[in-house]
Amino acid sequence: MLFPAFSILLISFFSLLSVVTTKTQYWCHGDGVLNNQHTCRFFTIVIDAGSTGTRLHLYKFIHDPAIASHGMPFKVEKEIFQEVKPGLSSFAKSPSSAADSLEPLLQRARKEVPHFMWEKTPITLKATAGLRLLPGDMADDILESVEERIFNSGFFAAFPDAVNVMPGSDEGVYSWFTLNILLETLFTDEPTVGHKPAAHRSVAAFDLGGGSTQLTYWPNNEAVFSEHVGYERDIDFFGHHIRLFTHSFLGNGLIAARLNILQLETDNEIESTHQLITSCMPEGYQLTEWEYALKFWNINGSSSHSFESCYGTTKNFVESSEIMHLRELKGSPVYLFSYFFDRALNSGLVKGNEGGKIELRQFKEAAEIACRREKTEIDDGSHWMPWQCLDLTYIYSLLRDGYQFEDNQPLVLAKKIKGMEVSWGQGLAFATANEFQLTEGAIKTALSSEPNSTVVDQIFDLVYSGTNQVLSYFNIISV
């Protein structure tokens, strides 16, 4: 499975033990006693620090030894979701306020996880493109403040990377796992299908964030790796090798694309006054104090306002980016989520969180309608309405001119599947939970025969406290 570069503390400890367990062991939710004989429930906390908000994904997992051999050793039984706004990048001038913004999420997690399970519940916070785009040391200052809050949360913070900026390609990979886990395309309880993952059963995942966009899929034809060198990720997923095609395009997220497209239409002299002009908004309309990456802009509509003009500029931006043609996916349904889903929902292309199937041409048709609206029609108080013409036009151009899908390309838009969010959070939670539980099981197995129970307890206390004293401590008792 794809594991985070986990705690130096635990990895070193695990290496020193040199133990291979014959059975995976899990912390039981009922009494907190480690065993591998009974159905167990345990938790993992993932905090998604995105460009527009910070989201808690708290997962309650269940492990049933009776069915674990059929594929995945545990499954999500329940997801708790909560979001706070704005995103961490909005606190660039006050890092301590960024840490304070997490408190409602941490309080919710403390409420949901039994107290005796806190130290057995791993927590991780991953920031995405919003922080990547901050200048200078601003991102580091925010992360330092946030890290202190996470490490003092009462949960198990996996040193040293419990808090960091997630590489864009990891977003894509974890999102792909979440999607395919929820759709049961990798493992299924249906005996006629089999329990071994296969490329032809999996689906492609397209994620559109604020600062970047990601695509990930499992190619049937591995020639694509020769055409696009560097887009390959070899993954071990619960003992099965998977070779994924994945890439993240920084600057092609929806909010970042807005600024890039607006700048293409605006003369440098006008732009220097923090004024931007766009044919994607009607003449006479002005959007004041729009903020992105700590800069404020006034956006002005144009007399050339139309879908054709807006599309022309948008297409120029998309074609100048690194988005590539994906022949293998043509005609096959691909799954779109995040801002893809949100803008489709705003436009009435789908209804409700379950989403639905559409064709690419419907994004174009929705964009044409949005681009015909007059000044009074877009000034209705909705934060997305003034941008609807540009956003829908960009999404259409990204898929049509970037990935070069035809207008009849089938698209599946999803926000939730089986009542759970489609995001990279669940994929990361599986990786984090499995790494944590395997390490805990190995330590417990290795020390179960230790005659001095006080020594065993002290080692676990050191592990849970996150102190690097455990290394020197273990060297002492190894002599």
From Swiss-Prot:
It is found in: Endomembrane system. Induction: By stress such as high temperature or ethanol. InterPro entries: GDA1_CD39_NTPase. Residues 1-7 are cytoplasmic. Hydrolyzes UDP and GDP but not any other nucleoside di-, mono- or triphosphates. May promote reglycosylation reactions involved in glycoproteins folding and quality control in the endoplasmic reticulum. Signal peptide: none annotated. This is Nucleoside-diphosphatase uda-1. It comes from Caenorhabditis elegans. The chain crosses the membrane at residues 8-24. Residues 25-479 are lumenal. Keywords: Calcium, Glycoprotein, Hydrolase, Magnesium, Membrane, Metal-binding, Signal-anchor, Stress response, Transmembrane, Transmembrane helix.
